[in-house]
Amino acid sequence: DQFYIASAATSTEEIWNGIGNPVYPPAREELARHGISCKGKRAVQLTKADYDKYDYILGMDHWNLKNMLRILKADPEGKVKLLLDYSDNPRDIADPWYTGGFDVTYSDVVEGCEAFLRYLQNIKKL
């Protein structure tokens, strides 16, 4: 009950006539290998209104960051960051659409989520 987590695209490449595509099959397969279902999930795009809905808006790479700031117009509260900024090894997370490394991307996302959780615990948000 402490978290509301959503995923949103920074482009419309996977959204046609207002309807988002389902999760890309190789990504869905990687998630399934880890017991994670993405059934019913479809692409949605980040909106300016999302800024007020969320305490943190995390991107995967610097290209995401640039696009998030373009969509949001500003980040006066410092909510927009890269997921791996919270890790001991800050870096971009490679887009597996281009690399094919869905397993590597999954590992990087897990690393970032675990680091972000530790950050929240350290600042007493949990």
What is the predicted role of each segment?
Residues 1-53, 118-126:
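Conserved active-site segments centered on acidic
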Residues 20-24, 61, 113:
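A structural signal for well-ordered alpha-helical scaffolds and beta->alpha junctions
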Residues 56, 62-126:
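Phosphate-binding/catalytic loops
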